[in-house]
Structure formats: structure tokens, C-alpha cells
């Protein structure tokens, strides 16, 4: 093999190796930042994984919100109509956060409690995030829950 071919072979091998390394690093970064959406029923079934980071979607159960006077930490339950999951959050809640409203929280399970890192609340009476609406639609139909449109199980 002449020197020019050998140099070209090393260059091609180096480029393939660098491309593989870059692909691996991108895949690892994306995997760490992906947070799948689960309902309380799916979490309690074990679909979310014991220590993985995920998003919890559902409705804030009426009468479940608790916060000590002067404290930032809040506790509440998120429900999908079939199951409830306790949530703990130690930051400032969004202005639109209310009981009976849709919420999506990102965090992890710790000792049977979902410890949220971030909480998003819906922005008006009729809006519900599409992912939450899709996952909760069957629970709403099952329990004949009326929606803003006035029909049971129909989420918009």
C-alpha cells in the first residue's frame, strides 16, 4: 500500500470514528432530556419506571392543595379520573394553577410521591394539552365527566 492510500485510509477511519462519537454523544444528550408523559394510572401501574424523569399529566384534584403558611412547598394530588398521585413542589406555582384544572408536571417518583421540578398549568377554561387530553379521554368517558364542550369525555 502506498503512503498516499494509507493516509487516505487513516483519514476515512478518523472521520468514521468522529462521526460515530458525535452520534453517540447526541443520542446520550437527547436520552437524558426526554421526559415522557404519563397519567397517574400509568405511573401506578409501573409504566414510568422507578427512578426515571417523566412528565405527569392530569387534573389537580379538588380539595387536595395544601401549603403551610409562609412556605413555598406545596402538596397536591393529580388525577386522571381513575387514580390519584400525590405531588410535592417546592418552587413558585404558575399564576394559572388551580384545583380542578389541567396540569403537566416534570419530575421523579420518590417514596411514592411525585417530586416535581417544573409545573405547567393550562391557560384558559377550554384548553388542555393535547397529550393530556388524549391520555385522559378514556377516563373521562368511563366516568362520564363533562367537559367545557358539555359532552362527557370530549376534551378540547
UniProtKB/Swiss-Prot annotation:
Its main location: membrane. It comes from Xanthomonas euvesicatoria pv. vesicatoria (strain 85-10). This is Cytochrome c-type biogenesis protein CcmE 2. Keywords: Cell inner membrane, Cell membrane, Cytochrome c-type biogenesis, Heme, Iron, Membrane, Metal-binding, Signal-anchor, Transmembrane, Transmembrane helix. It is found in: Cell inner membrane. The gene is ccmE2. GO terms for cellular component: plasma membrane. InterPro entries: CcmE, CcmE-like_sf, NA-bd_OB-fold. Residues 30-156 are periplasmic. Residues 1-8 are cytoplasmic. Residues 136-156 are annotated as: Disordered.
Amino acid at each position: 500500500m502506498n503512503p498516499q492510500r494509507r493516509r487516505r485510509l487513516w483519514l476515512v477511519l478518523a472521520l468514521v470514528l468522529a462521526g460515530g462519537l458525535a452520534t453517540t454523544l447526541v443520542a446520550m444528550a437527547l436520552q437524558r432530556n426526554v421526559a415522557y408523559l404519563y397519567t397517574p394510572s400509568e405511573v401506578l401501574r409501573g409504566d414510568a419506571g422507578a427512578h426515571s424523569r417523566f412528565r405527569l399529566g392530569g387534573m389537580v384534584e379538588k380539595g387536595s392543595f395544601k401549603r403551610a403558611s409562609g412556605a413555598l412547598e406545596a402538596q397536591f394530588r393529580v388525577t386522571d379520573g381513575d387514580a390519584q398521585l400525590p405531588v410535592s413542589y417546592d418552587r413558585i406555582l404558575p399564576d394559572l394553577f388551580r384545583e380542578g384544572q389541567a396540569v403537566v408536571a416534570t419530575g421523579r417518583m420518590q417514596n411514592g410521591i411525585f417530586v416535581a421540578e417544573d409545573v405547567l398549568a393550562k391557560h384558559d377554561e377550554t384548553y388542555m394539552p393535547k397529550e393530556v387530553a388524549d391520555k385522559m379521554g378514556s377516563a373521562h368517558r368511563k366516568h362520564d365527566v363533562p367537559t367545557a364542550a358539555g359532552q362527557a369525555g370530549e376534551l378540547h
